[in-house]
């Protein structure tokens, strides 16, 4: 299967936590933006072939009643990382909510933060304090660098979201 960064708006944030202490389970968590609930084989897709994801699903835990806390990537990710709803962390959208032609705007945009404040304890910080080494791979959009939020390994995540240079290559 070949992926091109412009082909689909899917965002992949993979958090892989490897235990440092024997007896703790490995945790591999996929947080994917714009993935429809039937866009993978194990959920019934007849169009997309996802054999590796299907295998992981058959051996792991699937959250069937989960929902996104926000309509797009950065606020959803901030909710997941902090355990807080959008009004608490203040990240409502990606970037400046006042973008676009202001004469066409029907509502005044809410003040928006673009960085998850250091005062929030992230899931990576909580796992790290319990003996896990945490990694993030993919889009970040929550501040300058994921290691400032508890991640020990960061591949491709920066404040602008995706890696510089235009893709995940």
Where do the protein language model's features map onto the residues?
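Bacterial N-terminal signal peptides
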Residues: 9-17
């Amino acid at each position: 299967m070949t992926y091109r960064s412009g082909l689909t708006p899917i965002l992949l944030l993979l958090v892989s936590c490897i235990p440092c202490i024997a007896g703790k389970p490995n945790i591999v968590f996929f947080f994917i933006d714009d993935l429809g609930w039937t866009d993978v084989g194990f959920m019934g897709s007849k169009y997309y072939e996802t054999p590796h994801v299907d295998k992981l699903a058959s051996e792991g835990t699937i959250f069937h009643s989960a929902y996104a806390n926000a309509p797009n990537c950065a606020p959803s990710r901030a909710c997941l990382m902090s355990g807080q709803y959008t009004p608490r962390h203040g990240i409502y959208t990606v970037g400046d909510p006042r973008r676009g032609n202001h004469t066409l705007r029907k509502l005044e945009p809410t003040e928006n933060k673009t960085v998850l404040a250091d005062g929030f304890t992230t899931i990576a910080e909580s796992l790290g304090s319990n003996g896990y080494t945490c990694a993030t791979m993919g889009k970040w959009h929550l501040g300058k660098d994921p290691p400032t939020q508890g991640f020990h390994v960061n591949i491709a995540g920066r404040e602008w979201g995706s890696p510089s240079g235009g893709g995940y290559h």
